[in-house]
Amino acid sequence: MADQAAILHIEIVTPDGVDYEGEADLVVVPGLDGELGIMAHHEPLISLLAIGETRVRTPEGLYEHIATGLGYAEVLFNRVRVVCDSAERALEIDTARAEAARRRAEERLATAADPAARAEVDFYRAEQALRRATNRIKVAQRRAGGGPTRG
């Protein structure tokens, strides 16, 4: 059990509301230039976030794995607030749906390679869709055993 003075409050908010809320002794978020590890008494911070995996280590030492979309993280007074366009815990991810989304995004990107069809494809959106789907698959695979992990 972690010392109460070394505890963070974490909240992950999407357009649908609060997706995750709890206590942690470590939060790792996907920053634009790499992962950011946040522990208690961290300096105040606001950082843009990339599509990636957010990991929350609970005071009991268990990890929650969450696929998060584009957004930002705010750290202030032992509180971490992640505001992003999407968030899914590993156990909530439908891998078949994520695989289908990945295939659709890959097909759109392949179509964009043809100059004649390029105007019909929004390359940026297809690329972001591929990143989201790949991230969801990766996070779900880390959690294939079910429940929070020890590492």
For each feature predicted by the language model, list its residue ranges:
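N-terminal export/targeting signal detector
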Residues: 1-9, 18, 142
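Compact, glycine-rich, soluble single-domain proteins
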Residues: 9-99, 104-106
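Acidic/glycine-rich phosphate/pyrophosphate-binding loops and surrounding catalytic core
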Residues: 87-151
